[in-house]
Amino acid sequence: MKKKVISLLAGLVFAVNAHAEDNALASKSVHWYIKAKVITEDIDALKAVISELVEITKTETGVTNYEFYLSENNMLYVFERYLNSDAGAVHGANVGETEAMKNIFSMLEPKEFVLFGGPYEGPWGGYIKSQGISPKLIGGFNR
């Protein structure tokens, strides 16, 4: 599971090519949710790595949310939202090969990944669809 999620995240840059859907906003915004078990005992080191990623991401104009939450039972929840697939790709290029990104995955055991804002084509589109990790919007709105 860990290798699949890491590979998926690494390749996500190429997968976030959204189509026009019934809901025009859904075809533009791209966001994902990640749940991971913290396997390091050094929470301060984890927070330092997260701070590095946050500082890099703050420079990106297409990011609307980049949030990390830590529960009392050491589950890390990450919510990322981008204006569009291009902004998601910029983010992937900016953080994808950094030491901070490599370090954070050594501290976590990914449990769940859900991508919103699809459907997606490209090299990861089939994988995302087959794993059921990109649900289709069936109602609602976003402002």
Name each model-derived stretch:
Residues 1-2, 15:
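Generic N-terminal leader/processing signal
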Residues 2-8:
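Sec-dependent signal peptide recognition
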Residues 10-18:
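Hydrophobic h-region of N-terminal signal peptides that target proteins for export
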Residues 19-65, 69-76, 83-93, 106-143:
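Short S/T/G/P-rich N-terminal loop/turn motif that feeds into the first structured element of a domain
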Residues 100-104:
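Amphipathic alpha-helical coiled-coil segments
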